[in-house]
Amino acid sequence: SGDLLDAGVNRSPSGYLNNPAEERSKYRYNVDKEMTLVKFVDDEFGPVGSFNWFATHGTSMSRTNSLISGDNKGAAARFMEDWAEQNGLPKQTGHANSDDFGSLHLPRRVSTIIPEPDEITDDLMQLASSYKASGGRILASSNITRRIRNTQKNNAKFVSAFCQSNCGDVSPNVLGAFCIDTNLPCDFNHSTCNGKNELCYGRGPGYPNEFESTRIIGNRQFLKAADLFNSASEELQGKVDYRHTYLDFSQLEVSVSTSTGGQQVVKTCPAAMGFSFAAGTTDGPGAFDFKQGDDKGNPFWRLVGGILKKPGKEQVECQAPKPILLDTGEMKEPYDWAPAILPIQIIRIGQLVILSVPGEFTTMAGRRLRDAVKNVLISGSNGEFNSNTHVVLAGLTNTYSQYVTTFEEYQVQRYEGASTLYGPHTLSAYIQEFQKLATAMVANKEIPATNILPPDMLDKQIGLLPGVILDSTPPGVHFGDVSSDVAANSDFRKGSTVNATFHSACPRNDLLTDGTFALVERLNGDNWIPVYDDDDWSLRFKWSRPSKLSPESFATLEWTIPEDAVPGVYRLRHFGASKPLIGSIEHFTGTSRAFAVR
């Protein structure tokens, strides 16, 4: 494990400051900076993967982004896997440095690691000009599957996972939150600008380019993970074990300490969302006149929420000081609006203990849970667990139930507190029940069986997205034909963007899960070889239907040429699947005109 200092900031510092000063003084930062990594090594194949846990939200991309994205966590995982593939699954130890993995630059695809020609010649330009757009053509389903899987031929056996932790109040927008109209910092307590939450946005390190912010935060996590991977020396030894149970969080009795030092039994509540939930966060502001830090509410929105379900006196008192906007735990039509039955789980791999929680714990909430479980493990064992036991919190696991704050943070009613579903004692309930799991694990006992199980609501799901009726092209045009091609006799320098638009069809006809909608191919002798696909950071696939009532649609492929791309002749290729009004889905492909890369 090691600290990563520049990939997350606290987006609700006023809530964090409501925690006891004595508790806050134990920690240097108001977010967790530690990344914990597990390196997996096979006796035969060597390193085959890594899992790491680090707390930062996957919100580098804004809510206006319309492209499918794994955000900074997904980017980090891809960078790590490309790096491992490029380095031949390195077995060396010692700290990685910038020379090992390109500093802040992205790792190269394996397919690009070949000797580079010294320069682009006129002959190469002439060669590129001889390859025109292929025109669209139909492919048999079996052929497209085989063809697309061939584009993945360089996939490594290495798998890297960048797991979430107690990220509830942690933002990757590390430059801070500013008003978009004045460029001044947002109000500290309410994250508003002249009373409006809609104007307050967090800024990532690549501001104003959200793609660059995503790349930078992903790359910072990758660099730290690569460093920990290369320096990993502590071997996990001991038992592999777990404990798992389901609990009804809408009515748990919890024993908590009182201000006089005694104990008091309290209860959790049916789920409810507070007014500040609708205010959103600096990573994605809400709308209307909502604001964070609202522990009063207002009559108009109480009336609106009450039309759906007016909370009773007991629920209001249980959730206090949260003013209830949506009484989701008591709204049952057409099915439950919020979960009540949740899973909790402890997994042990030697001296590593993973706490699987079904929500987003804030920084201090996660710290309290980790410490409570570790204390039980150490005090209840005969040295099997000790100060060297690593306890990590795996957030958003097994199911999702919004946020979990400390009791003190809950009083402030920032977004995270308003989204803590089961009332002010939610964290205490988690701590109490995880301590029971830890006690059972130490004693080598099973968890008492219960009849509590989450409801199966698969047959109640409502789908509002209409199916694809048909796809079509203009007369004389085929699926896969180029609508807007790369300019003739083009050559591009690294860092430039090349794009081509194709007549296409709805991607929902076939998600091409094992394949790709987009390829960049390079000429190698007489053959075109795939070098980048739509999972690569440099290549984007954008589908659009200019008229909602038209069956015609287009796919634009945008390739920003990486700095380490091999000079040569390239082209863009699109894959898709079209649906006729009558008949079966047909797969198609088409290519752009060739172009040269210097």
Regions found by a protein language model. Name each.
Residues 1-598:
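Non-catalytic substrate/cofactor recognition surfaces at enzyme active-site rims
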